[in-house]
């Protein structure tokens, strides 16, 4: 009679980071894909934020981001009396100029800011944000669609529009999803996560996103000096370009990084984990059936 073999594992981890800048958000590329670290929802003084666009660019570069989108509110302009700006593309133009000597890709976007339904949504890859200024909320979405923007539902669980933090899915939302007027959904916004929004993404095949929606200072909001990080969307694109990024977003090739956790669908989440962890060495401890395995972690995730 054969005796069962009991094999024990002793696992150690090494981290493949230099430690020169611990705040940089770092994840490996996947076979055939570039992993782009993106924050696609933020504000400056050109809507209701507290900083000039150059600060958003500087913060993004410090965090090692690949892509940001300027997404000022179309309808809500807190500082318009102090900073008049008839051109709603101005925030983007400034940010793009400030980023010209870096590798940061800046997208033109706007936040369509309406009552529920449909609520708030971001349209990115815009050609002209001014054309989204209209009384009819659906006309704003249709104009964004006309400009081939990628449109996603912002903070559907936001307490100001959903007091119980549920996702108030309306028939209008379903019609908009069916007509490609909503292509993605924030499952993470700022410091909040919605499991219901994630389920909605699964049910309606929406792209999942996580964003900072930052209005003030990134370092203060996410306690960067204490080891925190902003929420971001990891987008798996063929190359770092607007066209490739847009295609990847439309194909749902994303994972969210939030509070030191990875959230996503298995088709890209599992490859990301597999490419983050590598077996560095494996050997038996003398005179035992214990295998000492050393794994290398070349990502920010604390596996």
Where does each model-flagged region fall?
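Sec-dependent N-terminal signal peptides
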Residues: 4-13
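Charged catalytic cores and adjacent phosphate/nucleic-acid-binding surfaces used
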Residues: 19-38, 54-57, 118-126, 164-303
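Conserved catalytic scaffold of divalent metal-dependent phosphoesterases
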Residues: 156-158
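A metal-dependent hydrolase metal-coordination microenvironment
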Residues: 22-150, 154, 167, 171, ...
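Short gly/pro/ser/thr-enriched loop/turn and capping motifs at secondary-structure boundaries
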Residues: 75-76, 160, 215-218
